[in-house]
């Protein structure tokens, strides 16, 4: 299974979202559909999760890392995760939906208990090491 996530940054914080069906925050992203590239999936998921009033340039996505991990929901399932960094400013308004309960501009002052395993184990350490968040 292939999954994508996109990192948006503002004021040394990363944008994460809280799905209504999950206890933890995750990256903006989701599954790669059949006949779709990871980049196409990342762009589609950003449109879906951020809502119609969020504005971003689709040419500003950069693949930063990819790795394998075990699915939190099913330990027998292996996931290949692609992480993109958005090189620009996210404009407009973020819109909650049936799927997404809320958004958070995260920095380390929030701690790690609210984070998905992918954020906790891979993404946030990368962001801290590269001075992308505080």
Q: What role is predicted for each listed range?
A:
Residues 1-14:
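Conserved N-terminal beta-strand and adjoining loop/helix that marks the start
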Residues 2, 65-93, 104-109, 126-127:
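Active-site-adjacent beta-strand/loop module that shapes the phosphate/pyrophosphate-binding cleft
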Residues 11, 20-22:
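Short strand-connecting beta-turns/loops that link adjacent beta-strands
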Residues 17:
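Conserved active-site beta-strand element of glycosyltransferases/polysaccharide synthases
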Residues 21, 38, 90, 111:
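A generic "binding-loop/recognition-motif" signal
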Residues 23-25, 96-134:
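Nudix hydrolase/Nudix homology domain
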Residues 27-64:
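The catalytic Nudix box helix
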Residues 28, 34, 70-71, 100, ...:
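Functional cleft and adjacent loop/helix regions within the main domain
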